[in-house]
Design a protein with these regions (language model features):
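Conserved N-terminal beta1-alpha1 strand-loop-helix module at the mouth
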Residues: 1-96, 103, 108-135, 151-154, ...
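Non-cysteine beta-strand/loop elements that form the S-adenosyl-L-methionine
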Residues: 98, 135-142, 195
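Glycine-rich beta-strand-to-loop/alpha-helix junction loops that act as flexible
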Residues: 139, 172-176, 194-198
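C-terminal binding/interaction regions
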Residues: 187, 191-194
Length: 242
């Protein structure tokens, strides 16, 4: 089942204006997941991704229902990690996939109005994503992070490259916290994706607010990518926000 056609442009506009993206599990460190999500969204998180690899299907589906309900309350976007079938079942706004060759299947499963995101790890992968039917990319990991064991850090160079060449909105990801977020923004990112910086904070709300303050302090004007985002999306033939 495709998402309602009228919702596609609205969701893409919300994606384009998003600044802070949180990935989280179904049971984050045995915390109350709904309380954590509500705190994070109150602090300024715009997008929630459910990324759960360990639990059974029934429990993941229950978590997805919670994520979707909370996101609807806060007018946030809800994305599912690596599972187009779950995204369709729980009526998520979209799916995030980790490999370029998974994009076409995700798009076919969810239809043209769903949001499809893709992980990229190099300048070459950023360029390759320009030709794929995705709505956003994540670029990283900028710094090593235990959430991606074995994945080497790529540094800030791919961020700067994406700011100049990516035709889709992009999020810097990997080891970002309030102490280094300004570096990522100064490299060209206008969107940040985090896990531990908000999930593991004593107050997710305060952590999200701190990240947004760091962003505001470093973002001294439009990104060089803004002009690229105003051009037609190659696969859709319309502007990414429309």
């Amino acid at each position: 089942m495709s998402l309602p056609e009228s919702q596609g442009p609205l969701r893409r506009e919300r994606l384009r204006t998003a600044r802070l993206y949180l990935c989280c599990e179904a049971r984050p460190h045995d915390q109350d997941p709904e309380a954590l999500l509500r705190s994070a969204l109150t602090g300024g998180v715009d997008i929630l991704q459910l990324r759960e690899k360990q639990l059974g299907r029934a429990e993941i589906e229950r978590a997805a229902d919670t994520y979707r309900r909370v996101c609807d309350t806060y007018s946030a976007l809800f994305i599912v990690n690596d599972d187009p079938d779950l995204a369709r079942t729980c009526d998520a706004h979209g799916v995030h996939v980790g490999k370029h060759d998974e994009v076409a299947a995700a798009r076919e499963a969810l239809g043209p109005d769903a949001i499809v995101g893709l992980s990229t790890h190099s300048e070459e992968e950023v360029d390759a994503a320009n030709e794929l039917p995705v709505d956003y990319i994540a670029v990283g990991p900028i710094w090593e992070t235990p959430t991606k064991p074995g994945r080497p850090a790529v540094g800030l160079a791919p961020i700067a490259h994406a700011a100049e060449h990516a035709v889709h909105p992009f999020f810097g990801i990997g080891g970002i916290d309030p102490s280094n977020a300004e570096q990522v923004v100064r490299a060209g990112a206008r969107r940040l994706c985090v896990v531990r910086a908000v999930r593991d904070a004593p107050s997710p709300e305060a952590a999200a607010e701190a990240l947004r303050r760091a962003f505001a302090a470093a973002a001294d004007g439009p990104s060089s990518q803004d002009e690229l985002l105003d051009r037609p999306a190659p696969w859709r033939g319309v502007a990414p926000g429309g």
